[in-house]
């Protein structure tokens, strides 16, 4: 049976997420990936990707477009990257961001500082046999993970990958670089 994935398409690296999920789902007949711009677009989805971008902008646009409550109440799995990790938390260090409270964790925005402080690193991620090339772009970190949150990866600055039930959140951008292992782990987790 196919998997239906939506990508929140308000701001950020939407096209990259759509392309990565399409490739990850290529061998699953009947699967689809679509941009999500309205609450009614969430119907019948198995999963939702909340992309990187600017978390305060995405938060504001979610409210403006009537998406905050529908996304916060979404029952499928959520794949959140960078700004998506910020939004998926239940506590954020910036009052301009209205967190969705999907994952019990505290997230600090822009923990890496300015754009010039962005970097790539080979990261050990729990469940992956080989290190993952992680692209951090003005990335957040989780400073605390709550009950039931599995920490998948951390760096000296903090926690950078977590799983909570069917949700996964990353401070980095797994949709960049062509390594789809984390997408596949996420998709396999939807079948639980």
Curated annotation (Swiss-Prot):
Under catalytic activity, the entry for this protein gives:
aldehydo-D-ribose 5-phosphate + D-glyceraldehyde 3-phosphate + L-glutamine = pyridoxal 5'-phosphate + L-glutamate + phosphate + 3 H2O + H(+); L-glutamine + H2O = L-glutamate + NH4(+)
Please state the pathway this protein functions in, per its UniProt record.
Answer: Cofactor biosynthesis; pyridoxal 5'-phosphate biosynthesis
Could you name the active-site residues?
A: 82 (nucleophile), 173 (charge relay system), 175 (charge relay system)
Q: Which UniProt keywords apply?
A: Glutamine amidotransferase, Hydrolase, Lyase, Pyridoxal phosphate
One function term, GO molecular function aspect: glutaminase activity
Q: How does it assemble?
A: In the presence of PdxS, forms a dodecamer of heterodimers. Only shows activity in the heterodimer.
Family matches, as PANTHER family:
PYRIDOXAL 5'-PHOSPHATE SYNTHASE SUBUNIT SNO (PTHR31559), PYRIDOXAL 5'-PHOSPHATE SYNTHASE SUBUNIT SNO1-RELATED (PTHR31559:SF0)
**Entry protein name:** Pyridoxal 5'-phosphate synthase subunit PdxT
């Amino acid at each position: 049976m196919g998997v239906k994935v939506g990508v929140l398409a308000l701001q950020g690296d939407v096209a990259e997420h759509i392309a990565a999920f399409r490739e990850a789902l290529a061998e699953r007949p009947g699967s689809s990936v679509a941009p999500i711009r309205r609450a009614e677009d969430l119907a019948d989805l198995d999963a939702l990707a909340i992309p990187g971008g600017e978390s305060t902008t995405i938060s504001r646009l979610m409210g403006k477009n009537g998406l905050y409550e529908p996304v916060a109440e979404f029952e499928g799995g959520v794949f959140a990257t960078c700004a998506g990790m910020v939004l998926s938390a239940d506590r954020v260090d910036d009052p301009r961001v209205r967190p969705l409270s999907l994952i019990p964790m505290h997230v600090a925005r822009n923990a890496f500082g300015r754009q010039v402080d962005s970097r790539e690193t080979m990261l050990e991620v729990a469940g992956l046999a080989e290190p993952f090339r992680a692209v951090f772009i003005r990335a957040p970190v989780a400073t605390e993970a709550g009950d039931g949150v599995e920490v998948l990866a951390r760096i000296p600055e903090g926690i950078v990958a977590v799983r909570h039930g069917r949700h996964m959140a990353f401070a980095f951008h797994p949709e960049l670089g062509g390594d789809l292992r984390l997408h596949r782990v996420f998709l396999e987790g939807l079948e639980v």
